[in-house]
Amino acid sequence: MGATISILASYDNPNLFTAMILMSPLVNADAVSRLNLLAAKLMGTITPNAPVGKLCPESVSRDMDKVYKYQYDPLINHEKIKAGFASQVLKATNKVRKIISKINTPRLSYSREQTMRLVMFQVHIISCNMQIVIEK
């Protein structure tokens, strides 16, 4: 959620950041069907405190040691996600997908799918253009 909030803040206040490095931005909700999106919005409005789902610990990291620590960390909320929260996350994600091309703040995005390879991001640092390609 941090990257999503940063993107929304950058859109609302274009001069807020000089540049952004976004870790795992939540901008791809293609896996969610339209019916599920509609159901989430409806449930989020009618029954915002209803439990709707739980975060799969294996989605937190591929490092099983970290997954184990996550599962047994007493400071982490292991309850189900509430409908109101899920609805707001989907709403924010949908907005980000619509506005991301309008944001001029230089950004480097890094997601789990790109662990082995980051391809062709332009990062502008003090009027110096750099192209970053990292390959293993």
UniProtKB/Swiss-Prot annotation:
Top-level taxon in the UniProt lineage: Viruses
Q: Name one Pfam family in it.
A: Hydrolase_4
**Which Cys-Cys disulfides exist here?**
none
**Per the similarity annotation, which family is this?**
Belongs to the poxviridae K5 protein family.
| Protein name in UniProt | Protein K5
Q: Which organism is it from?
A: Vaccinia virus (strain Copenhagen) (VACV)
For this protein's source organism, the top of the classification is:
Viruses, Varidnaviria, Bamfordvirae, Nucleocytoviricota, Pokkesviricetes
